[in-house]
């Protein structure tokens, strides 16, 4: 699964150009999802030095991205809108459901891994 996440007021509690405190629950679940093999893309309007500062700050929090403001390489094409299964953004409709959705993805992946290769009798 590909998960796009915004930086300002999402990963960080501050708005551009500042970097505030980390959204610890969001970092924790994204780090777990990445460890399960999901792709995480930083999708932000930040550019240049502010973008690099955000990427470096996230790395210090333990989160490294598969791509920044572009598709993961295996998508095979470039588009202005990054292709993803889930978009996490402070301006998104239903933003209060982020953690529930991300935890559901994490638990579903754990379950699939647990039963991978197990044949079911019908």
Model-derived regions, located:
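C-terminal cap/substrate-recognition subdomain and adjoining C-terminal extension
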Residues: 51-122
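Alpha-helical substrate-recognition element adjacent to the catalytic core
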Residues: 1-74
């Amino acid at each position: 699964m590909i998960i796009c996440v915004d930086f300002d007021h999402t990963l960080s509690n501050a708005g551009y150009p500042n970097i505030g405190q980390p959204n610890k629950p969001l970092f924790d679940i994204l780090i777990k999802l990445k460890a399960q093999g999901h792709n995480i893309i930083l999708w932000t309007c930040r550019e240049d030095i502010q973008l690099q500062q955000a990427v470096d700050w996230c790395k210090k929090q333990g989160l490294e991205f598969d791509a920044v403001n572009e598709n993961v390489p295996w998508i095979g094409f470039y588009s202005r809108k990054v292709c993803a299964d889930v978009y996490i953004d402070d301006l998104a409709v239903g933003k209060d459901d982020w953690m529930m959705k991300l935890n559901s993805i994490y638990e579903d992946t754990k379950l699939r891994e647990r039963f991978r290769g197990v044949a079911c009798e019908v």
